[in-house]
């Protein structure tokens, strides 16, 4: 979830809870040498984006917004995505740092409960950027 920063550090921005990486937040400059496998993974200041040897990945909008979130998803789509590690169960890979391998081990009943909770929170319109492969990130530097 996006964060707000105060005197005691970052706190979840409750007006944007579970809405993913803020569309307007740009990635900071970085030294590509630190992305070699076995070195570092970089995170944005609010931990909604990660940069590593795979490229850049962004926290998804998990709110029930029909256009930018999971509003049109069905429980089976959610479960299949977390079991296969594929977006919508058949698309692009779900990238780090999302621990889909661990979450996907939950029972169907537990995953349906998580999905029901996500569908119950307020929808927030936030178009999260698409993942960027490492070569695309490096060519834009």
Feature map (PLM): residue ranges:
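Flexible coil segments in periplasmic/lumen-exposed cytochrome c-class electron-transfer proteins
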Residues: 1-57, 75-76, 87-141
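Mid-length scaffold segments of soluble, non-membrane domains
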Residues: 58-61, 66-72
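Short hydrophobic alpha-helical module
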Residues: 65, 84-88
């Amino acid at each position: 979830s996006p964060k707000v920063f105060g005197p005691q550090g970052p706190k979840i921005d409750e007006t944007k809870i579970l809405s993913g990486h803020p569309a307007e937040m740009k990635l900071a400059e970085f030294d590509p040498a630190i992305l070699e496998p076995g070195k570092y993974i970089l995170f944005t200041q609010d931990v909604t984006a990660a940069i590593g040897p795979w490229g850049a990945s962004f926290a998804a909008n998990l709110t029930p917004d029909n256009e930018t979130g999971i509003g049109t998803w069905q429980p089976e789509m959610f479960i299949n995505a977390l079991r296969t590690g594929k977006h919508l169960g058949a698309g692009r890979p779900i990238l780090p740092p999302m621990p889909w391998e661990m979450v996907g081990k939950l029972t169907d009943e537990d995953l349906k409960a998580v999905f029901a909770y996500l569908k119950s929170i307020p929808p927030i319109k936030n178009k999260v950027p698409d993942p960027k492969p490492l070569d695309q990130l490096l060519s834009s530097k």
